[in-house]
Amino acid sequence: MQERIEQIKNIVENWMHSDFHSPATDSEISEFEEKMKVKIPESYKEFLRCSNGAELFGGDAILFSVNASDKCKINYDFSEGKVPKELLIIGFYNSCHICYDARYGSFFFYEYEDYDSIKEECLEFSDFYEVLDYIIDIAIN
């Protein structure tokens, strides 16, 4: 995970500036999960242990934190309730929510598609590493 964060930090075009937050502790992650009654996937916990949220590439991507006082905390729905409650929202990229669907153990870029057709209609990633790889690839190509 740290390698990907360093790769993002090294992309330094003017509009591509990225800001990373201080790491979250395991106890902060556990407390958030308990309080919010959510289960954060392990690959996103690995990110949180490196950076408790981030703004990537001038705001093209926002990765949510476990800081309960942040507006952009995990499960923040900027669409005002249009994301199915079954999806765990961990951020957004361009116009899509970055979500985790426990049914499939996968991450998706979700933009108001039919929840029952999410696998057919949305970009799917097996873990959060793949999400970051995709975002990095788009940024550098």
Walk through the language-model features, giving the residues of each.
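Short acidic-glycine loop/turn motifs at beta-strand connectors
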Residues: 101-104
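Short aromatic-glycine-(Arg/Gly/Cys) micro-motifs in beta-strand/loop hairpins
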Residues: 107-112
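A surface-exposed partner-binding patch
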Residues: 1-98, 139-140
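Compact, glycine/acidic-enriched structural inserts
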Residues: 116-135
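Mid-sequence acidic-hydrophobic segments that form the walls
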Residues: 106, 134, 138
